[in-house]
Structures are given as structure tokens and as C-alpha cells.
Amino acid sequence: MQGDVVKALLEALGADVVTLPEQFGSRQVVDWSGLPGKTPRALIRPRNTDEVATAMRICNEYRQPVVTQGGLTGLVGGANVLDAELALSLDRMNHIVEIDRISGTMTVEAGTPLQVVQEAALDADLYFPLDLGARGSCTIGGNLATNAGGNRVIKYGMMRDQVLGVEAVLASGEVVGALHKMIKNNSGYDLRNLLIGSEGTLGVITSAVLRLRPRPRAVATAWCALPSYSAVTKLLEEAQAGLAAGVSAFEVMWAGYYDAVLANLPELRAPVAERYPFYVLLESVGGDPVRHAQAFEEFLGRMLEAEIVSDAALAVSESDALAFWAIRDAPGEYPKFIPDHAAFDVSFSISNVGDVAQRCDVRLRERWPQALVMIYGHLGDGNIHIVVDVPGAGKTLHGEIDDVIYDVTREFHGSVSAEHGIGTKKKAYLEFTRSDADVAAMRAVKAALDPNGILNPGKIF
């Protein structure tokens, strides 16, 4: 029966929307994970929600599996096509529908790139706080499907905290949700939050109402060098008290990460002269630029005087701040010097992060003394990234490295996925984080909304 589905889609939507492999040729059809994917039987590129609904209704009738794709910047294979599947790309649905300055909202289609949203908000003298390294390529739909986190969760929360309304198409072709602008809405089950983070397994998100914030009038950024992990956590504690709600980023980097990226990426420059065990990129936002800058400098002075911070560099220009952020955003350059690395996105209670990092480092080096181990992350929300490369091993050891990291994650009752999702890459380790009852409940929701199992099958569980 599936053999006729492409014909039915072509008849309903036309060749401009439905294309065959020989027509889309070398177009990217896999994400950044490096995991294998298949060429889709056809690529559907709808222009609006009605065309998404038509496509899903036909696919459901034919029991045809469909994978929704955004910017394909995911790192867990969540958007990769498996056997005999169709791909549904939302890249044409990339319009900003409305900016409502009074409500502080932006209504956008799911294929809109994150950076476009950020820039449009600034043009309206507002601010959309979600930010991550793939900002130029990732899309709002993908950010929603994975409940993206990024660099400023410490102040603004995850992607679900930036959304007021969501519109989506179910497997049946029915359109659900509402593009409302209400902060308070307790009218039954929250379908919005059910769809956010579902990795395209429950519905195709087509549009959203995003919550905008007042544009910060002042941004202060500093690069801090610290003598110990206890000093890092003390700096976090002091920053949250001394800078109040202003702390918008607290990015910690262990020395192994800092040394490796500076040694291999000559375009980066060291913010401080000496080498230290830990580094923190601290950012704070506020209202009055003069007062905020003064308060930030005074805070840094107190931290240096108390020897919590050993050395610091204050960004005196936007280019200085961008240079600091370039060091933190260096993971995008890994293919240049560690193309076969294994990467992990895990989260823990903030109080456990230091012990987790130490235990992972010790166990990895016991197994592979020559391994490059890089640890960094968003300490303010307990999310760290661990990158491991064993010289000469290629990707042959990835399974064993996975076991080491996820065993430690289970020991500390952490999450195997802080912000990247599960996809196919982490399926085997979902039980390390979620109970059998949790997974059974998720399967029940999946069966209710997608009884034929056509939406992104083989992902999550």
C-alpha cells in the first residue's frame, strides 16, 4: 500500500511540494550527529499548515512513516531518515507573521531560523533570549521539538519557557493547539508543553507564538580564571546574590577544554596570560548602562580581592565580548581537529557537577590514558558537555566511551540528555534516566496521538 503514497501526495500537492530523490540530489538529509541516515523516498516541502495537514492525512491513510526536518543541526539523529521513510521539511515555512509589541510576542512559522527571530526582535527593540551555537542554521520548529536550552537558561529558562502558543498537525492531519498570546491559560491539558520536546513523534509543529522580553540596555561580560571547582561554585553563588537577576550566562570551562581549543584554533586569543584550572564566561544584563557597568566592575573587584577569581578580563567593547564567546562556541570547530570525537550532553544537580566531571575524567583516563577529555557547560542550570577523543581510534570506541559516561550519569541520578534530545543515539540509555513506568506512560501518549506510529518512528524509545 505504501507504494502508492508518493503518487497520492503528488496528485494532492503537486511536484513543487513533493520531490523525488533524483530531484533533490545532494540536499542534506541527515543531521550533524554523524549517525547514518537513509535517503527519503520523497521530500515534502509544504508552504503552509494546510499543506502539512494534507500530507499527514495521506501518509496516515497509507501508513507511511514521516520524519519532520528543520535545520538539521541536531546531534542525536532525531531528524535522520530511517528505512522507507518520507522527509517533511519546513524550510519554506519561514515567515515572521507578526510582532506584537504590546503583548511582547512574535508569531512565527516553524521553519524560521533562530537568528532571524533574534534579529527581528532586536529590530523591534525587544529581545528573544534563546541562544545556541547553531543559531544561524537551527529553526524554531527544531528548537521546540527538542526543547532547546543553550547559553542563557540560567536567567530565561528553556525553550518551553519562551513560548505562549503552538500550532501543530497530528498524524491524522488534524490541526491542534492555538496561536494565543495568553500567559495564563489553565483550560485543560497543556498540549503546547506536550508537543515541545517530543522530537517530532507526537505532531508536526507548524507555528508558534514566542514570548519576547525587554531588550537589555546594558550587557557586561567578563572572562574569569579560577583556582578550583569550589571557587567556581562560590563565584556562581556570589554572582546570583551580588548581581541579582542580572546573571544571563555562567559558562564554565575546565582547563582541558580551554587548552585544546586555543592550541588547535589559531583564530582564538587567550583572554588572560596564565593558565588556570577553570575558566568562567560571566555575563550580566541590566538597565542603566553606566550603573550596570560600575556594579559589574565592583563585583569583579570583590571576587578578585577575595581570591575567588585569580584573574579576569573585562570586555570593554562588543568585539571583546565576541572574542570571549568565540572560545565558548568553539565546539562548532571540532571537525577541524577531532573529527571522530564522542560528545555528551548530560545534566545533574549543580552540587554534583564537579564530582561528576572528576569521576568521568578518572574513569576515562584509566581506560585510555592518551584520551583528550574536554568538559564545559552551562553550570547555572547543571548542564555539562563532555567531549572525548582517543587518538588513532576513530569512532571504534564510542560505544565503550558511552558506557563510561552514562554509568556515571546513572550513579549520580542525572539525565542522559540535558538539551539535545534522545533521537536514536541515546535510546539505549533512556532507562538510565526514566523509569519503566515513565516510558510506558510516554508510549501510551504516543499511541493515543499517533496510533499508526508514522511520526518519526524509532526515535526516543
Give residue spans per PLM region.
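FAD-binding subdomain of flavoenzyme oxidoreductases
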Residues: 95-249, 455
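C-terminal substrate-recognition/cap domain of FAD-linked oxidoreductases
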Residues: 20-28, 214, 220-228, 233-404, ...
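Short, hydrophobic/aliphatic alpha-helical segments
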Residues: 52-66, 121-138, 175-195, 365-366, ...
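N-terminal flexible segment immediately upstream of the FAD-binding catalytic core
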Residues: 1-57, 74-104, 257-269, 318-345, ...
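Short, ordered loop/turn segments at secondary-structure junctions
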Residues: 70-73, 133, 255, 421-422
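N-terminal accessory segments
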Residues: 1-32, 61-64, 303-319, 411-416, ...
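Activity-critical C-terminal alpha-helical subdomain
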Residues: 174, 427-461
